Amino acid sequence: MFKLALTLTLCLAGSLSLAQHNPHWWGNRNTIVHLFEWKWSDIAQECESFLGPRGFAGVQVSPVNENIIAAGRPWWERYQPISYKLTTRSGNEEEFGDMVRRCNDVGVRIYVDVLLNHMSGDFDGVVVGTAGTEAEPREKSFPGVPYTAQDFHPTCEITDWNDRFQVQQCELVGLKDLDQSSDWVRSKLIEFLDHLIELGVAGFRVDAAKHMASEDLEYIYSSLSNLNIDHGFPHNSRPFIFQEVIDHGHETVSRDEYKDLGAVTEFRFSEEIGNAFRGNNALKWLQSWGTGWGFLPSGQALTFVDNHDNQRDAGAVLNYKSPKQYKMATAFHLAYPYGISRVMSSFAFDDHDTPPPQDAQERIVSPEFDEDGACVNGWICEHRWRQIYAMVGFKNAVRDTEVTGWWDNGDNQISFCRGNKGFLAINNNLYDLSQDLNTCLPEGTYCDVISGSLIDGSCTGKSVTVNEYGFGYIHIGSDDFDGVLALHVDARV
């Protein structure tokens, strides 16, 4: 009997963790966008007017629970929680619930960035949060939950990143480190996440997951409610989990400890794709992209060119400030069948602490748009760049096909097909790509969705005529505005 019970327990745990890799997308949609620091009302409108019609699968939203108010309102104040009340600069609980409902109604899922590792760092005396709650972070007193000092690990600094104890039980940049092995802490975290599930979210990005023991997270995840069927989720659906685990391959705490609990953020993907498109590694080597580069299995990897943290760091990672290379890297990211894809939607920044666009009263301002639909007034909105949203459509059109017909020039010009549904070519050399290439597409004329769109039966940008053998003449000049060309069956004239 004991063996049978143990077997059933293990099977249940295994099935739950497998289910937590499912992002619950509608139809053929398969790209998440991180609308960093957007207000809930603006996200709701964006789901209805842009993301839904353009085929985006979901939105990662900024932390939803009450945080400290820091001088100047830097973005990182959202990562310093003081209670689980759903009031932030993005809006209140009613506005959040309205956003989730409206986005789900148009097939765009919501994934919340959640903070399970810690509460706010040191601030002297009593602080007041975004919902009006008082706390004394230095004393580890958070009555809005409530948490007291006994709910936290003893205060210590992380000085040795090769010491598992320090990484998982000391304070990450001074943030008060919760004890997730505590029954009380577990109950409050589960209560918080279950409330979000009740409101209709599809899952969670778990911040700082490597700083929590995987067995504690497994307990928390397995204790969560199923997703809310009133928001269109099938019965017994589990929340999608993707966990922030920074692992460069030599970490004491490994991504492998978390990959069976849910997807894991594949930071090596971000670093290597940046290296390649900055010219530090020839694009020809991308033919083996994915597990051949030491990355996680595709279904366990949350992939991205940049995120809200590493886009602010020096190094190989690309961001919106290198637009030509960034668009090429994003096109490759969305065209190559590896990982669970997320694209970034940023605001402009000059330094690490730059706050989101705000008014004189330090309230986040809504994005405004020009006549082409691009964002202005401090918002970058990469997801509204044609070269990026068109590749979201490309990724939808070619879903469930494999890479075929790889070609390269032995250097930084490459092309490949996605079955007989799509074709991508990239030129990252300082000379033109001019070549008859196998597009693998049926005979016909196709619009390049990077340089333009298919509107009323004609192309506003480049077009390529494909012959009966699937070949077409591909030209990408070294001085072209974009170094990439993309064709797919849904953009056939």
From Swiss-Prot:
Site, Transition state stabilizer: residue positions: D309
Disulfide feature: C47-C103, C156-C170, C375-C381, C417-C440, C447-C459
Catalysis performed (reactions): Endohydrolysis of (1->4)-alpha-D-glucosidic linkages in polysaccharides containing three or more (1->4)-alpha-linked D-glucose units
Gene Ontology terms, MF aspect: alpha-amylase activity; metal ion binding
Top EC class of this enzyme: hydrolase
Cofactor note as given: Binds 1 Ca(2+) ion per subunit. Binds 1 Cl(-) ion per subunit.
Name of the featured protein: Alpha-amylase-related protein
The organism of origin for this protein: Drosophila teissieri
Source taxonomy: Eukaryota, Metazoa, Ecdysozoa, Arthropoda, Hexapoda
